[in-house]
Swiss-Prot record:
Organism of provenance: Schizosaccharomyces pombe (strain 972 / ATCC 24843) (Fission yeast)
Keyword Hydrolase: yes
RTR1-type ZnF: 60-139
Locations listed in the record: Cytoplasm; Nucleus
Entry similarity comment: Belongs to the RPAP2 family.
Physiological role: Putative RNA polymerase II subunit B1 C-terminal domain (CTD) phosphatase involved in RNA polymerase II transcription regulation.
Enzymatic reactions: O-phospho-L-seryl-[protein] + H2O = L-seryl-[protein] + phosphate; O-phospho-L-threonyl-[protein] + H2O = L-threonyl-[protein] + phosphate
UniProt-listed PANTHER family: RNA POLYMERASE II SUBUNIT B1 CTD PHOSPHATASE RPAP2-RELATED (PTHR14732:SF0)
Single annotated GO MF: RNA polymerase core enzyme binding
Main localization category: cytoplasm
Protein name (record): Putative RNA polymerase II subunit B1 CTD phosphatase rtr1
Pfam families noted in UniProt: RPAP2_Rtr1
Amino acid sequence: MNKKSILKKPKNAQSTQEKQLITWSKSLIDEARSRLQYDFFALEWIEKLVDPVSLETLEEARKYLRKSDYDQVVKERKLVNLCGYPVCPYEPKQQTRYKLEDSGMKVYGGLNYYCSKDCFLKSCQYMVELSDEPLWIREDAREAMKQHLDPRQDEAFRKELENKKIEDVRLLLQALPVGYKAKVGEIVEHPLANEQS
């Protein structure tokens, strides 16, 4: 007589659970990958704002930055000796932390990151208006990521770059003396044929 254990699950149930676990872990990995791409996108904007930018660029960045991201921009700009307000091209001035005013002593802790009180106030106003929501929750950021990660755009950009390189080579060839054009032309026009021989 064949005895069956009541504690063991049937093989079909176990394989179904394993499949569900695999599916769940794949979706979790995809979600983590997606969030990481959003973080890289925000990092690109942080890097873009380290150099002085126009007001339009700063307004565009508002859609993709959180307050903590903007704080990183201010700190990075201080490291490269620029005012913390991304529009300003000047160096920050060494400020004292405390100032005496009519109403008494006031603490200005963040002024060392800025060239003036005006830039400090503009930067604070900008930061207050930024969202605290993560980037992957915002609808406008999702649309931008779809465009940013569109493989057709990347392919079109690569083709455009290749065409530019070919045009640059042709311009260089035109500037060469007559005797050199034949040798260089063979190399440029038929690189694989020359490599095989």
